[in-house]
Amino acid sequence: MNVSVNIKNVTKEYRIYRTNKERMKDALIPKHKNKTFFALDDISLKAYEGDVIGLVGINGSGKSTLSNIIGGSLSPTVGKVDRNGEVSVIAISAGLSGQLTGIENIEFKMLCMGFKRKEIKAMTPKIIEFSELGEFIYQPVKKYSSGMRAKLGFSINITVNPDILVIDEALSVGDQTFAQKCLDKIYEFKEQNKTIFFVSHNLGQVRQFCTKIAWIEGGKLKDYGELDDVLPKYEAFLNDFKKKSKAEQKEFRNKLDEARFVIK
């Protein structure tokens, strides 16, 4: 199998400023030290053709940051991502303009992807049909529910037939019938040996079609491997975490976050 995505020592840092004065000092003074948050810390993994990788972890662990870097909408501070093929990212409202109608968003997003108007015209009916939006396709997206936005975004991205698909919680909203239709489409992609990254808190969906699991905790890759090896460990952790009181859960999160802040 060929490597489709190679994530090499990826770190994503955010400088934290309490005042504009701190921001100015950081811009003007060489090697000025400031509080820095590590959203991701030295993550490396390889994805092969046909892999369906579930990105799991509690809220704030860094899953969406990693998916955005894989998709190319966010750049790492350190490290690199090599991609072998076209990438599409499906997240709620990703790449959609609230001021434009649904059909205008189809054209705008596909133009940004590099498609010609003739190609867009030919593909638009398929996108509208898959989205099930009907007459709402002519309404501004700002009037859409989160489920409708997810339907439109998913329909555009699966119709353009990418080599690598990144799905970030896009199936967590909307009706279950549409979600199942999306999963069926993802199965088709899987059979075509495409690479899929799937961010979800729905472990039923993760178990249903993922082949591998990347467990992100506190911005670090805690574990990565075959579904049957990693998912039971994560489920055991999650069961223990849910048994904690709200105060204990907060303390656990705070300890993880404290380790992600450094002065540099």
Curated annotation (Swiss-Prot):
Catalysed reactions, semicolon-separated: ATP + H2O + teichoic acidSide 1 = ADP + phosphate + teichoic acidSide 2
Signal sequence extent: none
E.C. number(s) listed in UniProt: 7.5.2.4
Keywords, ordered alphabetically: ATP-binding, Cell membrane, Membrane, Nucleotide-binding, Translocase, Transport
Domain ABC transporter: 5-243
Pfam family for this entry, one: ABC_tran
UniProt-listed CDD domains: ABC_KpsT_Wzt
Subunit and partners: The complex is composed of two ATP-binding proteins (TagH) and two transmembrane proteins (TagG).
Function field: Part of the ABC transporter complex TagGH involved in teichoic acids export. Responsible for energy coupling to the transport system.
Family the UniProt entry places it in: Belongs to the ABC transporter superfamily. Teichoic acids exporter (TC 3.A.1.104.1) family.
UniProt protein name: Teichoic acids export ATP-binding protein TagH
